[in-house]
């Protein structure tokens, strides 16, 4: 093909006036726009062509090669065009390829093929003849043709054919955005902007008026273009340069007839409904701009113009289909679609979809264990094979299949697929991600969901399949190969091809791994288990009760419905009859009314499950409450003990201090009065006082002085304490030597008798411990007996007892030269050690072993434990009593030793039990428990007198009587009353004696209870013996003796 090369020369005449000059002021040419160089007011490099600000006229001299006036369309050239600026190029060959320049053109003659990455899209040719009312074009018969520079702006209310005749808005729209509203695609004459490609524009630089004439040639080049339309799958990207170097491009691809026309028809209809207000404003602005352009006052005020090309009316547009992805339905029109979006059904499904996305792990764990059969097309799940088959045959599924067939969407296979609840959640999350991605890419000003306008000719199969594949078992993401037109309620048309936005690709890449990961989690189970589950779901349950379902016919004998007598229900679907007979409800009624032996799976109701969960939750809360309460009680008890210890420590220090102050010698201080406080607040010669303000202390009462005086009288002397300490320490050391000797003998015998290596046996004697009053510190003056417990590794026997009793004197002789008498008592299971030096002391060593208490005889059989025992084992009860004394000593050291006045009061009462026969039957261990409970239960620390009074009050209240609460032993596993050894008479006698002692305390006669003489009064006013009045001989003797006799009688009764 030979290219037509017209030579066009432009002559610049700066002084021309008249109508043509005014028209030229607008700088309007018959050039169409779409992919041409852009005009602006900033000069670009290599631009020699400039426009003045004065009135100018342009004449075009056409070479005789072209038969008519040139109104060049922008077309790319193969070779570099040596021009001063990027100018429009006439391409005759291209015009020939598109059907030449005749006026009659149809929209179907234009096909859009796939563009390569570097080639700008070629627009349709522009005709210069037969212009309609939109243009005022003047042709000149002279060789120099003058162009009318005025372009009349037409409002964007054109018909669909006029809109469809515009050059390639589907491709160029994404890259060339206009200032005026979008419906008519009207643009400013000298300003172009791009939405997605940033390009530098060539500016128009003002130049001085000059009569010089600039001539340049335009060489159009031919480009072979296939007349068959093809879908544009590649959006070209442009690189701005001073000159355009484009090569000839051959376009090829699949043909999509009517694709562009349908798109622009949809765009026209949509924007006519949404942007009528903006069109009116744009029309007013265009009129004002046109008026300013005719005045020629300013070069920059140029009225926007639209393309000066017309095409014949297009064929009727195909019907629009508004499809809702959430509800899987289509709407007839935008109004119906809008009403659907505002309806309750759509809102409920959308809320259900959001709820499924926000499903917690607990709900998933409850409902996720049930396998279901899912229909990918309708996005519904069925609990069994029968339900799935009924759904496939149902009208809803068939309707969706028909709609997808009409839209050209792929229809998934109807084979049932086993899915779980986690798969459904993954699908919902994936769909939510894709919808959020599409809404984020479009600048939407409407809050409604995206409206998808689909035509029957547009193929959406690939994008649909990609969405389906993202939720299927495989995580393969298919590449989008066809454009997806989505109108989102805004003012911007999005048309995308293979070049997907980076943000969308990033969102897709982020969404895909998550869905793939969820799918992989679902497919952890092997295929065999999935097959078994599918077989279990598809396993047919035998229908029962055919005879109880009767057919209801009309007058003509036609079956209109079915009625089940068992369930009292009716249904008109023949398919539902079989399902009802297999259903759980019908089977339960059949089992209840007909055959009780029918096996029906037990499926707990949601209400029962919720009740069970509520019970478990309350139980856990109750356990947590009690656990916390126990911890708090334990913490309070520990804090109370700590505070009491600290308080009593300060009290003792203060008591020592005041005792030292009261013990000042009669002659005064030996070294003079105490001096001033030292550097650390301590007076010389005085014990250090506690820091801080001294707590207020109640002065000693009369009862306290009596109790302390009595305690000092019954406390052991220093000689007795040293004697006890000496004999106990010697006994402990001797028993240690006996244990060592017995261990050495066992080793020697083992080596001689057997050469085999055996595990080393434990020592026969594990240790010796102090028990009784010796361990508790309750010794009284005159006590000569102390107790020790010797722990053995095995059950003690008579042979062991005799062996120890024989070895003990030898070891004692090694340690101490003094003589001791050692005797063994088999009935008492003990060894008795007596000293021969005054004060004579006696130590009772009881043998026991922890193995005895660990034995628990079986129910109904008392002898198994005794069968294994050696024949000469010692008395079991004596050994158990020794173990109990160990526990008692440990408890006393932990609980009673820390209480103030507790040990003092126990010593006083032990002395009372020894002096008064009534109290001799009171057990020592029960007495210790009673005193500890009485003192520890008080609100604060008790002085010795108050503590003794409180103990008598407790006994007087009847705590030890037969019907009383008693005293449980805290050292025993099973409940055991420590007062069990006392009879009723002994309990009543002790209670009565305590009440009498309490009366004596109330009348200041505590000395009678303690069995001591009254103390002398330190104050002379209360001293009876200092009475100066002379006593009558007769009265004094009778009254004193009588009073003394009465006191003596009361004391003896106590």
From Swiss-Prot:
Residues 744-761, 1042-1054 have a biased composition (Basic and acidic residues). It comes from the Eukaryota. Residues 683-1053 form the DZF domain. Pfam families: DZF_C (PF20965), DZF_N (PF07528), zf-met (PF12874). GO terms for cellular component: cytoplasm; precatalytic spliceosome. SUPFAM superfamilies: beta-beta-alpha zinc fingers. InterPro entries: DZF_dom, DZF_dom_C, DZF_dom_N, Matrin/U1-like-C_Znf_C2H2, NT_sf, Znf_C2H2_sf, Znf_C2H2_type. The keyword Transmembrane helix does not apply. The keyword RNA-binding applies. Residues 342-366, 491-517, 657-702, 741-761, 1023-1054 are annotated as: Disordered. Keywords: Cytoplasm, Developmental protein, DNA-binding, Nucleus, Repeat, RNA-binding. It is found in: Nucleus; Cytoplasm. Residues 355-366 have a biased composition (Polar residues). One of its GO terms (molecular function) is DNA binding. Involved in postimplantation and gastrulation stages of development. Binds to DNA and RNA. This is Zinc finger RNA-binding protein. It comes from Xenopus laevis (African clawed frog).
């Amino acid at each position: 093909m030979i290219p037509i090369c017209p030579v066009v020369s432009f002559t610049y005449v700066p002084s021309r006036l008249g109508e043509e000059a005014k028209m030229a002021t607008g700088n309007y040419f018959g050039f169409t726009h779409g992919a041409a160089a852009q005009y602006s007011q900033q000069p670009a490099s290599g631009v020699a062509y400039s426009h003045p600000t004065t009135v100018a006229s342009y004449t075009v001299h056409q070479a005789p090669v072209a038969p008519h006036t040139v109104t060049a369309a922008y077309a790319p050239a193969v070779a570099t065009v040596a021009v001063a600026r990027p100018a429009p190029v006439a391409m005759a060959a291209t015009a020939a390829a598109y059907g030449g320049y005749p006026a009659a053109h149809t929209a179907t003659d234009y096909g859009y093929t796939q563009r390569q990455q570097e080639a700008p899209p070629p627009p349709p040719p522009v005709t210069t003849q037969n212009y309609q009312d939109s243009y005022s074009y003047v042709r000149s018969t002279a060789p120099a043709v003058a162009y009318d520079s005025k372009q009349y702006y037409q409002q964007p209310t054109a018909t669909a054919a006029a809109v469809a005749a515009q050059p390639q808005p589907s491709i160029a729209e994404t890259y060339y955005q206009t200032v005026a509203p979008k419906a008519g695609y009207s643009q400013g004459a000298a300003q172009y902007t791009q939405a997605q490609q940033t390009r530098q524009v060539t500016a128009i630089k003002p130049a001085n008026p000059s009569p010089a004439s600039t001539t340049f040639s335009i060489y159009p080049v031919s480009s072979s273009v296939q007349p068959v339309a093809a879908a544009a799958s590649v959006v070209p990207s442009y690189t701005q340069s001073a000159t355009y170097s484009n090569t000839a491009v051959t376009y090829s691809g699949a043909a999509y007839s009517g694709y562009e026309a349908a798109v622009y028809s949809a765009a026209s209809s949509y924007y006519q409904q949404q942007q009528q207000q903006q069109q009116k404003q744009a029309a007013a602005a265009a009129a004002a701009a046109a008026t300013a352009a005719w005045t020629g006052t300013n070069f920059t005020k140029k009225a926007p113009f639209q393309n000066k090309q017309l095409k014949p009316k297009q064929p009727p547009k195909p019907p629009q289909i508004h499809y809702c992805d959430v509800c899987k339905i289509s709407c007839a029109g935008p109004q119906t679609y809008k009403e659907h979006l505002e309806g309750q059904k759509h809102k409920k499904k959308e809320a259900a979809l959001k709820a499924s996305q926000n499903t917690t792990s607990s709900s998933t764990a409850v409902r996720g264990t049930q396998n279901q059969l899912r229909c990918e097309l309708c996005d519904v799940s069925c609990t069994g094979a029968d339900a799935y088959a009924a759904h496939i045959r149902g009208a809803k599924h068939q309707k969706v299949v028909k709609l997808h067939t009409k839209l050209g969407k792929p229809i998934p296979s109807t084979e049932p697929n086993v899915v779980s609840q986690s798969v459904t959640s993954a699908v919902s999350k994936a769909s939510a991600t894709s919808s959020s991605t599409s809404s984020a890419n479009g600048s939407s000003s409407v809050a409604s969901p995206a409206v998808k306008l689909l035509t029957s000719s547009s193929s959406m199969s690939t994008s649909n399949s990609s969405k389906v594949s993202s939720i299927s078992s495989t995580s393969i993401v298919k590449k989008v190969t066809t454009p997806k037109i989505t109108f989102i309620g805004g003012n911007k048309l999005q048309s995308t091809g293979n070049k997907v936005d980076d943000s969308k690709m990033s969102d897709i890449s982020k969404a895909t791994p998550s869905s793939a990961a969820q799918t992989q989690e679902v497919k952890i189970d092997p295929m065999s288990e999935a097959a078994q589950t599918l077989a279990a779901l598809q396993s047919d349950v035998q229908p029962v009760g055919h005879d109880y379902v009767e057919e209801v016919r009309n007058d003509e004998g036609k079956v209109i419905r079915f009625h089940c007598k068992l369930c009292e229900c009716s249904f008109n679907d023949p398919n539902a009859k079989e399902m009802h007979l297999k259903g759980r409800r019908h089977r339960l009624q059949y089992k209840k009314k007909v055959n009780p032996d029918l096996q029906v799976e037990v499926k707990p109701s949601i209400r029962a499950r919720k009740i069970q969960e509520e019970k478990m939750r309350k139980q856990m809360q109750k356990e947590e409450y009690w656990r916390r309460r126990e911890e708090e009680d334990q913490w309070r008890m520990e804090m109370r003990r700590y505070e009491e210890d600290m308080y009593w420590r300060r009290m003792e220090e203060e008591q020592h201090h005041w005792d030292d102050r009261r013990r000042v010698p009669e002659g005064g201080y030996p070294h003079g009065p105490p001096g001033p406080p030292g550097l650390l607040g301590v007076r010389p010669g005085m014990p250090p006082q506690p820091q801080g303000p001294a707590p207020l202390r109640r002065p000693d009462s009369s009862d306290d002085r009596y109790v302390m005086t009595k305690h000092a009288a019954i406390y052991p002397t220093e000689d007795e304490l040293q004697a006890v300490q000496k004999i106990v320490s010697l006994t402990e050391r001797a028993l240690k030597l006996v244990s060592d000797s017995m261990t050495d003998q066992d080793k020697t015998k083992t080596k001689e008798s057997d050469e085999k290596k055996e595990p080393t046996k434990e020592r026969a004697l594990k240790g010796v411990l102090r028990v009784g009053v010796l361990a508790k510190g309750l010794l009284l003056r005159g006590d000569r007996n102390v107790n020790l417990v010797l722990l053995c590794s095995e059950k003690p026997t008579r042979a062991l007892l005799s062996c120890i009793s024989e070895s003990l004197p030898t070891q004692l002789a090694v340690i101490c030269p003094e003589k001791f008498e050692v005797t063994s008592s088999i009935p008492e299971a003990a060894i008795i050690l007596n000293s021969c030096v005054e004060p004579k002391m006696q130590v009772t060593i009881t043998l026991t072993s922890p193995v005895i208490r660990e034995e628990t005889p079986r129910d109904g059989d008392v002898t198994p434990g005794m069968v294994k025992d050696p024949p000469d084992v010692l008395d079991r009860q004596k050994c158990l009593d020794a173990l109990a004394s160990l526990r008692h000593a440990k408890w006393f050291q932990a609980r009673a030793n820390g209480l103030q006045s507790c040990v003092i009061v126990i010593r006083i009462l032990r002395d009372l039990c020894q002096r008064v026969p009534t109290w001799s039957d009171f057990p020592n261990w029960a007495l210790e428990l009673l005193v500890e409970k009485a003192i520890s239960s008080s609100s604060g620390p008790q002085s010795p007198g108050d503590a003794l009074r409180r103990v008598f009050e407790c006994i007087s209240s009847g705590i030890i009587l037969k019907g009383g609460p008693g005293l449980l032993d805290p050292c025993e596993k099973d409940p055991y009353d420590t007062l069990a050894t006392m009879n009723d008479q002994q309990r009543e006698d002790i209670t009565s004696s305590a009440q009498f002692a309490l009366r004596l305390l109330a009348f200041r006669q505590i000395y009678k209870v303690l069995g001591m003489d009254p103390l002398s009064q330190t104050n002379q006013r209360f001293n009876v013996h200092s009475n100066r009045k002379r006593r009558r001989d007769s009265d004094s003797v009778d009254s004193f003796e009588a009073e003394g006799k009465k006191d003596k009688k009361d004391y003896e009764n106590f």
